């Protein structure tokens, strides 16, 4: 019963985030009645910030679980060499750092990067052997975050959609790995998404 309550609360929070901010997809049509029991900041920037912090909290819980259950606490050079994941990162040219900050360029890059991460989060959700509820929450809430950020990008054409065949390629890579490497791959995805979101959070705070 407690897990059901937690799940309902988490979903309610995500729906509140989505309905309280203009989104380009179906989420914009969700009922706002779910928002009545939860008080959230009123500005759009704060809503993005709160959602990023929510996702980071879920990632932290998953990483702790991987460390405790699967002994995946640190990266190894062997694992990095064998995982050709090309995970998104933020660089100086992306305009997200205080030096050379450019809001439009930064928003576009964060949105595109998170869309790329969605493919890796499919792997996480389908293959994670621990708390699947938290894994699903990371996947769902990242989708909502993409919609929230994309709605703020002025030139929508600059947001590039990942190649759909990449998902099948990533799944094939994972299936070819032994259990140790599978756990390492999931650990790397979580760690990289955490880093990406932490930099994104800093950028959102100066927008």
Curated annotation (Swiss-Prot):
UniProt keyword Hydrolase present: no
Protein origin, superkingdom: Eukaryota
GO biological process, one term: positive regulation of receptor signaling pathway via STAT
Membrane keyword on record: no
Entry's localization field: Secreted
A GO MF label: identical protein binding
InterPro entries hit by this protein: 4_helix_cytokine-like_core (IPR009079), IL-6-like (IPR003574), IL-6/GCSF/MGF (IPR030474), IL6/GCSF/MGF_CS (IPR030473)
A Pfam family this chain is assigned to: IL6
Principal subcellular localisation of the protein: secreted
PTM-bearing positions, type Phosphoserine: 76
Family: Belongs to the IL-6 superfamily.
Quaternary context: Component of a hexamer of two molecules each of IL6, IL6R and IL6ST; first binds to IL6R to associate with the signaling subunit IL6ST. Interacts with IL6R (via the N-terminal ectodomain); this interaction may be affected by IL6R-binding with SORL1, hence decreasing IL6 cis signaling. Interacts with SORL1 (via the N-terminal ectodomain); this interaction leads to IL6 internalization and lysosomal degradation. May form a trimeric complex with the soluble SORL1 ectodomain and soluble IL6R receptor; this interaction might stabilize circulating IL6, hence promoting IL6 trans signaling.
Biological role: Cytokine with a wide variety of biological functions in immunity, tissue regeneration, and metabolism. Binds to IL6R, then the complex associates to the signaling subunit IL6ST/gp130 to trigger the intracellular IL6-signaling pathway. The interaction with the membrane-bound IL6R and IL6ST stimulates 'classic signaling', whereas the binding of IL6 and soluble IL6R to IL6ST stimulates 'trans-signaling'. Alternatively, 'cluster signaling' occurs when membrane-bound IL6:IL6R complexes on transmitter cells activate IL6ST receptors on neighboring receiver cells. IL6 is a potent inducer of the acute phase response. Rapid production of IL6 contributes to host defense during infection and tissue injury, but excessive IL6 synthesis is involved in disease pathology. In the innate immune response, is synthesized by myeloid cells, such as macrophages and dendritic cells, upon recognition of pathogens through toll-like receptors (TLRs) at the site of infection or tissue injury. In the adaptive immune response, is required for the differentiation of B cells into immunoglobulin-secreting cells.
Protein name as it appears in the record: Interleukin-6
Protein species of origin: Vulpes vulpes
Encoding gene, per UniProt annotation: IL6
